[in-house]
Amino acid sequence: MEAERRPGPVRRRRRSGLAGRFANRLVRAAVLVAIVPLVLTLIYCLPFVHPVSTLMLADLATLRGYERQWTPLEEAGRNVIHSVMMSEDGQFCSHRGIDLGELKAAINEALSGERTRGASTIPMQTVKNLYLWPGRSFLRKAIEAPLAIYLDAVMPKHRIMEIYLNIAEWGPGIYGVEAAAQHYFGRPSRDLSRREAALLAVTLPNPSERNPAQPSAALRRLASVVEARAQRAGGYVGCLGST
């Protein structure tokens, strides 16, 4: 009976070499994927660049198309800017990409088994819209947080807000505050009343199920709260200049 043949040293070295090359390529690909958003963020700092979101790209890829009219921040309208900020991220001007207080509270709620609150800041939502995928997951949050800190470090606050307002989804195929204002209220965003601006703002967390033009009673109550906050937003919006 012949002795069982064992792989020789040459074969083992060949397998080891293939595994090493595969691992090397995998690392290079991971580094490339990590670098892309860092480079794009620097490009998006330029005021004449009009970024698109991953959802907008998906709409183009599936031939659905989308509505979006890029609007400079100073033309978006004070009512909309203040309402969105007070609804989505009241500490936008004071934090550095992530709101540690809200994040800590959300983590504590998750660990205790409670339903977690939203802890996403406007920078976090902006990098999610620009580079990541929708839906909730710890993996996405783990990527989102450092990207948001980087975004806030290299990009002026007013530019972050401008990009966010122009790529946020306000319904199927409707992106940006100007397209939303025209679609739901038939007028430019700068001409929206405080009430209309508040209704648009409270639609953002769930635009597929909330309609600012036909709000439910609960949505109207939430809009009333945001409208009141927006009227007192003076001390919170200093980083946005005279908007």
From Swiss-Prot:
Metabolic or biological pathway: Cell wall biogenesis; peptidoglycan biosynthesis
Keyword field contains Membrane: yes
Catalytic activity: [GlcNAc-(1->4)-Mur2Ac(oyl-L-Ala-gamma-D-Glu-L-Lys-D-Ala-D-Ala)](n)-di-trans,octa-cis-undecaprenyl diphosphate + beta-D-GlcNAc-(1->4)-Mur2Ac(oyl-L-Ala-gamma-D-Glu-L-Lys-D-Ala-D-Ala)-di-trans,octa-cis-undecaprenyl diphosphate = [GlcNAc-(1->4)-Mur2Ac(oyl-L-Ala-gamma-D-Glu-L-Lys-D-Ala-D-Ala)](n+1)-di-trans,octa-cis-undecaprenyl diphosphate + di-trans,octa-cis-undecaprenyl diphosphate + H(+)
GO CC entries: peptidoglycan-based cell wall; plasma membrane
Keywords assigned by UniProt, alphabetized: Cell inner membrane, Cell membrane, Cell shape, Cell wall biogenesis/degradation, Glycosyltransferase, Membrane, Peptidoglycan synthesis, Transferase, Transmembrane, Transmembrane helix
Annotated localization: Cell inner membrane
Pfam families: Transgly
Gene Ontology MF, one: peptidoglycan glycosyltransferase activity
Transmembrane segments: 29-49
GO biological-process terms attached to the record: cell wall organization; peptidoglycan biosynthetic process; regulation of cell shape
EC number: 2.4.99.28
Its biological purpose: Peptidoglycan polymerase that catalyzes glycan chain elongation from lipid-linked precursors.
Family: Belongs to the glycosyltransferase 51 family.
Protein name: Biosynthetic peptidoglycan transglycosylase
Species of origin: Chelativorans sp. (strain BNC1)
Lineage: Bacteria, Pseudomonadati, Pseudomonadota, Alphaproteobacteria, Hyphomicrobiales
Gene, per the UniProt record: mtgA
